């Protein structure tokens, strides 16, 4: 097998027993694909599909004027080029976007002609605002911040049938309902009430009898009954009543009379329930009519209008209940036969018939008016308005759209064959929904499960952006329609008709302030990936936290392989925000689907099919871990399978599909937890959430016990530099990597040089540090997709969120009580958990009413010392070390002119005009921050003169750009000439300077002539002459292009910045803060085992083993049993084995053993013990590569134990044995303070520990003096306000309990809100007198005022 550049350097031993059938797909595909479909930027305008922007334009255009004499048609759209690149946008606080230009055509028709003759056509490109572009990593830069648009899981459009679970009515009766949900438009609900009448609601308004809707659709009462009921014929004679007998309809009824056959034999006795046996006898006896007593017919309903044949008048309307009078009337009218509705209580209820009786309307118009009244109460209805409203509700394309998904779901649910159709509803659609609802109420069919993933779909970025864009276009449409009528007369152009502001505003609002447009979580590469793969049920058109019940949040069987059952936040959002499973993707309809291998006749094939939750339940699907033989046949007689959302056992021959991988169930974060299968789900949830909070450490350290997913996450997250093309490394420094591309990957006319600029010490959204470090050296060969530089939390191309620490599970003097963690001082000395945080502090100079603020080093009443770190422009130097309270940017603000006292006037008169009054409003370092200034950026308003510092920064940036571009040209030039040299040498020349005709060109010849003269050389072979001309032309073009790029950059830097109104200048100062680990910091493992550091002990006091090696971290063993996360113990054992093997390899390297011996030992580790599916091909490694591999393994042999397919206990023991370590994983430890051995052996090993972004430095602060609340005059709370610690109700009770009266008085008065007491106390302390005189607390005055506001007067009486 082929190894990538980094894999060769450090192979991870894989314990997986199952073959890797399918590579993990690109993890950001859901974001990138969705937005690519939205913009279709890579397709030519005429080949664009009807999706995304194209669909939005097509749905709104053409816009026709009210008179119909003018129309505006859409032709195509084009996306421009972004003004700034991503990094410039972040720096300037701009949005990374491209201008959208739309080509539209204005057509004016001739008014006079009868047929629509075209009078005039004008075509023009119109600017339609900017469309934010997605960066390569699936994020958006909006106003300078990186944001992510989270996908939304919402209810799919379509029709749903459900019941209220008996909650509505006290009797507990199930009330069924049906709901038609469109993609946009009014919702239509049908529902039963406790009396079994059917009602309809539109948009959840007041309910009306369902028959009103049917009447409004143009159905008469007779047609309604005919559609929903079967009829029975009744023959009416003078003395008897006979019923046409359909035996099957009698099933389950209790007879009130005897039923006899033609011969008079009794088939069913009186009072018996009719069974299937009776029905068979009746069918045999060929009885067609049955004489029934009159009572049988009473209470039934007529199926048709009964009409007097002579006069034609309606005697009895259909649906009339049959009473004695009705029977008499029928007999007297000589009606011999009529039809009644066939109903019974079992499977054919009289619901619609009963509803029709309560319906007050008689005609279609009355029904329309009734609906109008319900939708628009208080407005007088007219025939036209009522018809128009009803037409627009469900039958107009503008107002109603089921969408392709909705139509597909709708037709499938109603059992129709075709999956496509109109986006609007038809009469038949509504009738079918009602019919299905009634049959469900009759006990035929089942209700839907709304939490089934076949009924919930994912709306990704592209789709949401398209919806917002359409909203903007619809607003534009209204304005355009009004202007179009003017266009006919005034000869306007399309430009004058379209105002793009509403579109731009809608798009901007969506990206800037939608609930689903979130500030990207950029703690580490994993948190970025997880954020982009998140699926939220909240947001516009989704659920709200308060309303979401338990069922929506719960894990559903259809989540298997689509949504992770583990990773979800704890707290109010649990279950509403989920993460996509590793292999899941969305299909064209937006439903999540998961890959499966096809199984044919018990043999597993490599053919992979994606199944959505809708299709999955009908198949029999085996687990990925099902046993197979060498040919892929299932070996077990009974295989554990999933079928119809249940787990069951089936014969091997019945299996139709098989899972692709055991980790397809979990998300990326959960699949990074080793031994996940041994952890309790709640702890695994915490583990996967806490990995996202790990802060990138100064030196990344790969986990020795991993899962094999680390490489995928690092590669796909976008924090590393990945080679676009293969080749050789030309040069490397800390800031850039230059690759000379291999010939086979270089297209003709390309210089074949790739230059990668690295990101250095940049601030992330979470104030952590983003920095890339090259891992390749000059001369290294690389191929496409190899990792060239590690990003934050990446080590040799693998995700490395924390550090491998030597830990012991034991108690130690109570320092690890309640999950506390005891840490050795060695961890601090080695900077294992030292992290760099970068803070951005901003100083803004504004234009105020009293004059403009000024950034200057001339600050009133500030000593020389405080200004030492500022330059002449008043801005701090880069590299200065600053602490709390230091000035970073000097700024003065004009003060209001105060009224002068006579004395001041006199002084002014004597000493002349004093400097204008300004106050110091400089930017200072916040309390508890100490760091180094690493960068300063100055932005000046366009039109203002730049200060010296801005000019210096600008010059430095320009020099850097010029240097980069020259370097780039030099490299390209070198590569070009090297290529030419290889082509020319050895071939015959025909003319040129320094060469002789007919001679073969040599290296010496070429070295002798000037490079510019190379192009003048003519060769005998014309192909070579062409190559020379092409190369010359390319170099000229490249130079030109680089010069243009330089000029462009220069222009951008020279023009002023576009700042907010009233802002003159912005200075941004970036501070790098180094944070060592200290007591109070939060740490965690990957198994949900979190704790706070209680103390940092000297190394000599820590427990140590027989070899004198001390422990780094001591954890509490009581944290394991109750939490049931045993994975951490297995990780500790395997970590110990890994480090032990590393130590053995280290010794072999130090002793300079034979390479063959090393090779054999490595083979033993990788290919003998715990032999997985993957066999490492060490024979393909050269001796140098084996030696380099061995050197990289000295710190521990990395292991991969995948979720549900990991290392077995026996394998861990075998590796411990190979490493010459005790198989129990326990060893005797000695107390560092006394040297005595502890009572029993202790579990010692290596665990991967993370430092979480909950640092004590960010949380702890102390208040000395600070601001007070305005009304209560009590100190504020919280770190941001520099607030105090609240002495609350319970604390007061504690002091009361101790009887500490004076302390309590002090707390409630001078230390809180006794204003006069505070001042007096301050004076006393200044005078050296430490007495306190408490006064009246301000909060008491507030209470008095509040009581007075109720009209009760309270006054305090003075004690005389």
Curated annotation (Swiss-Prot):
Taxonomy, superkingdom:
Bacteria
**GO cellular component annotations, sorted alphabetically?**
DNA-directed RNA polymerase complex
User: What's the name of the protein?
Assistant: DNA-directed RNA polymerase subunit beta
* NCBIfam families, alphabetized: PRK00405.1, rpoB
Keyword Protease assigned to the entry: answer is: no
Q: What does this protein do?
A: DNA-dependent RNA polymerase catalyzes the transcription of DNA into RNA using the four ribonucleoside triphosphates as substrates.
Q: Where is the signal peptide?
A: none
Give the intrachain disulfide bonds: none
User: What reactions does this protein catalyze?
Assistant: RNA(n) + a ribonucleoside 5'-triphosphate = RNA(n+1) + diphosphate
Top-down, what is the taxonomic lineage of the species of origin?
Bacteria, Pseudomonadati, Pseudomonadota, Gammaproteobacteria, Cellvibrionales
């Amino acid at each position: 097998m082929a190894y990538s550049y980094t894999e060769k350097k450090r192979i991870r031993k894989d314990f997986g027993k199952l073959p890797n059938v399918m590579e993990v797909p690109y993890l950001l595909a859901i974001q990138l694909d969705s937005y690519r479909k939205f913009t279709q930027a890579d397709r030519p305008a005429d080949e664009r599909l009807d999706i995304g922007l194209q669909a939005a334009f097509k749905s709104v255009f053409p816009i026709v004027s009210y008179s119909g004499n003018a129309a505006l048609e859409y032709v195509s759209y084009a996306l421009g080029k972004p003004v700034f690149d991503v990094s410039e946008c972040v720096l300037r606080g701009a949005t990374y976007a491209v201008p959208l230009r739309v080509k539209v055509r204005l057509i004016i028709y001739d008014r006079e002609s009868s047929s629509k003759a075209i009078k005039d056509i004008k075509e023009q490109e119109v600017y339609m605002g900017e469309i934010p572009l997605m960066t390569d990593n699936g994020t958006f830069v909006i106003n300078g911040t990186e944001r992510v648009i989270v996908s939304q899981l919402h209810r799919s459009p379509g029709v749903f049938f459900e019941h209220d679970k008996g909650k509505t009515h006290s009797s507990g009766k199930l009330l069924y309902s049906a709901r038609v949900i469109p993609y946009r438009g009014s919702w239509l609900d049908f529902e039963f009430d406790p009396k079994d009448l059917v009602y309809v609601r539109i948009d959840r308004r007041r309910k009306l009898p369902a028959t009103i809707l049917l009447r409004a659709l143009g159905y008469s009462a007779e047609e309604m009954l005919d559609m929903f009921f079967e009829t029975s014929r009744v023959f009416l004679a003078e003395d008897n009543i006979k019923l046409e007998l359909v035996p099957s309809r009698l099933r389950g009824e209790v007879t009130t009379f005897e039923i006899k056959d033609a011969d008079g034999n009794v088939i069913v006795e009186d009072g018996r329930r009719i069974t299937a046996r009776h029905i068979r006898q009746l069918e045999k006896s060929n009885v067609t009519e049955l004489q029934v007593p009159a009572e049988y017919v009473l209470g039934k309903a007529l199926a048709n209008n009964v009409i007097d044949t002579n006069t034609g008048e309606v005697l009895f309307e259909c649906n009339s209940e049959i009473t004695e009078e009705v029977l008499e009337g029928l007999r007297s009218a000589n009606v011999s036969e009529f039809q009644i509705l066939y109903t019974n209580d079992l499977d054919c209820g009289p619901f619609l018939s009963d509803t029709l009786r309560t319906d007050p309307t008689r005609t279609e118009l009355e029904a329309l008016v009734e609906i109008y009244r319900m939708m628009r109460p208080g407005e007088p209805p007219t025939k036209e308005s009522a018809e128009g409203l009803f037409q627009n509700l469900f039958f107009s394309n503008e107002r109603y759209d089921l969408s392709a998904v909705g139509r597909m779901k709708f037709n499938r649910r109603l059992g129709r064959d075709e999956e496509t159709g109109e986006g609007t509803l038809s009469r038949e659609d509504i009738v079918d929904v009602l019919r299905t609802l009634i049959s469900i109420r009759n006990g035929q069919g089942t209700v839907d499960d709304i939490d089934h993933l076949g009924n919930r779909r994912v709306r990704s970025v592209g789709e949401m952006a398209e919806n917002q864009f359409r909203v903007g276009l619809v607003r534009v449409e209204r304005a355009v329609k009004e202007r179009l009528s003017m266009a006919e007369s005034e000869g306007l152009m399309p430009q004058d008709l379209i105002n793009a502001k509403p579109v731009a505003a809608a798009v901007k609002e969506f990206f800037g302030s939608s609930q689903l447009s979130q500030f990207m979580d950029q703690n580490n590469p994993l948190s970025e990936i997880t954020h982009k793969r998140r699926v939220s049920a909240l947001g516009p058109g989704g659920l709200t936290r308060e309303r979401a019940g338990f069922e929506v949040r719960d894990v559903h069987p259809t989540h298997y392989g689509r949504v992770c059952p583990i990773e979800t936040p704890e707290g109010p959002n649990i279950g509403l925000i989920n993460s996509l499973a590793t292999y899941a993707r969305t299909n064209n309809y937006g439903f999540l689907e998961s890959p499966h291998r096809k199984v044919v006749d018990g043999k597993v094939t490599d053919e992979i099919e994606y199944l959505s939750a809708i299709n999955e339940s009908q198949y029999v699907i085996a687990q990925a871990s099902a046993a197979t033989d060498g040919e892929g046949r299932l070996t077990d007689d009974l295989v554990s399978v999933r079928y119809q959302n249940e787990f069951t056992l089936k014969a091997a021959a019945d299996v139709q599909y098989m899972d692709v991988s055991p980790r397809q169930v979990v998300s990326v974060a959960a699949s990074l937890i080793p031994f996940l299968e041994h952890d309790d789900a709640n702890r695994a949830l915490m583990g996967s959430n806490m990995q996202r909070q790990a802060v990138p450490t100064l030196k990344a350290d790969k986990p020795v016990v991993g899962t094999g997913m680390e490489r995928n996450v690092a590669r796909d997250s976008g924090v590393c530099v990945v080679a676009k093309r293969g080749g050789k490394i030309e040069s490397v420094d800390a800031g850039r990597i230059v690759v000379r591309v291999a010939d086979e990957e270089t297209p003709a006319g390309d210089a074949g040089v790739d230059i990668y600029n690295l990101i250095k010490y940049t601030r992330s959204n979470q104030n952590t540090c983003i920095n890339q470090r090259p891992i390749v050296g000059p001369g290294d060969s690389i191929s496409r997709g190899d990792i060239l530089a590690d990003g934050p939390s990446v080590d040799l191309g693998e995700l490395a969120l924390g550090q491998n620490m030597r830990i012991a599970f034991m108690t130690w003097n109570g320092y690890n009580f309640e999950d506390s963690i005891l840490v050795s001082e060695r961890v601090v000395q080695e900077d294992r958990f030292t992290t760099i945080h970068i803070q951005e502090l901003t100083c803004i100079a504004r234009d105020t009413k009293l004059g403009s603020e000024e950034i200057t080093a001339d600050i009133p009443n500030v000593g020389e010392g405080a200004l030492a770190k500022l330059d002449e422009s008043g801005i701090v130097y880069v590299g200065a070390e600053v602490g709390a309270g230091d000035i970073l940017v000097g700024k003065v603000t004009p003060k209001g002119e105060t009224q002068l006292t006579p004395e001041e006037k006199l002084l002014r008169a004597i000493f002349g005009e004093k400097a204008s009054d300004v106050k110091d409003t400089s930017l200072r370092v916040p309390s508890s921050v100490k760091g180094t200034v690493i960068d300063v950026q100055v932005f000046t308003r366009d039109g203002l003169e730049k200060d010296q510092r801005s000019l210096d920064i600008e010059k430095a940036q320009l020099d850097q750009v010029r240097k980069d571009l020259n370097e780039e040209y030099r490299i390209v030039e070198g590569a070009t000439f090297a290529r030419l040299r290889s082509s020319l040498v050895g071939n015959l020349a025909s003319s040129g300077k320094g060469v002789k005709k007919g001679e073969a060109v040599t290296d010496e010849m070429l070295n002798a002539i000037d490079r510019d003269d190379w192009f003048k050389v003519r060769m005998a072979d014309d192909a070579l002459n062409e190559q020379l001309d092409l190369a010359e032309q390319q170099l000229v073009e490249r130079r030109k292009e680089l010069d243009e790029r330089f000029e462009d950059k220069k222009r951008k830097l020279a023009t002023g910045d576009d700042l907010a109104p009233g802002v003159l200048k912005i200075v941004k100062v970036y501070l790098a803060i180094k944070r060592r680990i200290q007591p109070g910091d939060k740490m965690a493992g990957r198994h949900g085992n979190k704790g706070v550091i209680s103390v940092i002990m000297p190394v000599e006091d820590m427990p140590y083993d027989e070899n004198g090696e001390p422990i780094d971290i001591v954890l509490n063993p009581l944290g394991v049993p109750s939490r049931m996360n045993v994975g951490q113990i297995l990780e500790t054992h395997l970590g110990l084995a890994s480090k032990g093997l590393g130590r053995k390899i280290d010794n072999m390297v130090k002793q300079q053993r034979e390479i063959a011996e090393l090779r054999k030992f490595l083979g033993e580790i990788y290919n003998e013990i715990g032999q997985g599916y993957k066999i490492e091909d060490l024979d393909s490694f050269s001796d140098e590569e084996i030696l380099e591999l061995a050197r990289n393994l000295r710190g521990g042999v990395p292991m991969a134990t995948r979720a549900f397919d990991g290392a077995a206990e026996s394998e861990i023991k075998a590796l411990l044995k190979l490493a010459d370590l005790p198989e129990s994983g326990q060893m005797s430890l000695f107390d560092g303070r006394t040297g005595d051995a502890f009572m029993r052996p202790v579990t010692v090993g290596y665990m991967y520990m993370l430092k979480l972004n909950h640092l004590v430095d960010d949380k702890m602060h102390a208040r000395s003096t600070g601001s007070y609340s305005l009304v209560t005059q009590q100190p504020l709370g919280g770190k941001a306000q520099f607030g105090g610690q609240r002495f609350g109700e319970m604390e007061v009770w504690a002091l009361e309990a101790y009887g500490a009266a004076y302390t309590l008085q002090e707390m409630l008065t001078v230390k809180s809100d006794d204003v006069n007491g505070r001042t007096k106390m301050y004076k006393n302390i200044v005078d050296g007198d430490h007495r306190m005189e408490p006064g009246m607390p301000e909060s008491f005055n507030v209470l008095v005022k509040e009581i007075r506001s109720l009209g009760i007067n309270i006054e305090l009486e003075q004690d005389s």
